[in-house]
């Protein structure tokens, strides 16, 4: 009987550093990587492209069911491919981020994408980045981490990222958007943003990314007894 590939789930709010942590862990362990948030962003982008209403669950479900998405790691960067097109940059806009949070609130949309996410579980293992990886998608994962940070710190990180790309941003507006999104994600009826009961809660507010990676890898290796 073939053993089920192990999964390390990394959940947490937007801007906590999940993406950077997951890439580092996947590289260190040489495991596969799933950015579940990207799947919802790809669906949101497809909906925007095809003029499908973000408030119409009936219209979104068939779009989600036939969504052709895959991840390709190239030179340490994760490329998100939608129907053969690299949409890695396009899905990272604030418009798409807000739209993704909206479509993720629908139960049948989540069900349509659930099987696709679980299909990423292959040997030697999977690093799963998301908001409900440890509570819904991979509840049997042997290692679960909930990465958090204050809303102010996350808004500041996002502002710096946007400024580096040449965008002019207002901190207070960005903070308000993050708080609104947090409230929506944490209070939705289906798969709210909460740590799994058996997850390690790691607050990155006052930690460098190197410290976060070190703590997460140490915890994962202890749980998995990896050398």
From Swiss-Prot:
A Gene Ontology biological process term: pyrimidine nucleotide metabolic process
Family matches, as InterPro entries: Cytidylate_kin, Cytidylate_kinase_dom, P-loop_NTPase
Top-level EC class as recorded in UniProt: transferase
Pfam family membership, one: Cytidylate_kin
Record-listed E.C. numbers: 2.7.4.25
GO molecular function, one term: CMP kinase activity
TM ranges: none
Subcellular location: Cytoplasm
Annotated ATP binding sites: 12-20
Keywords: ATP-binding, Cytoplasm, Kinase, Nucleotide-binding, Transferase
The UniProt record lists the keyword Ligase: no
Catalytic reaction equation(s): CMP + ATP = CDP + ADP; dCMP + ATP = dCDP + ADP
CDD domains on file: CMPK (cd02020)
Any one of the GO CC terms: cytosol
Domain of life: Bacteria
PANTHER family documented for this protein: CYTIDYLATE KINASE, CYTIDYLATE KINASE/PANTOATE-BETA-ALANINE LIGASE
Family: Belongs to the cytidylate kinase family. Type 1 subfamily.
Protein name: Cytidylate kinase
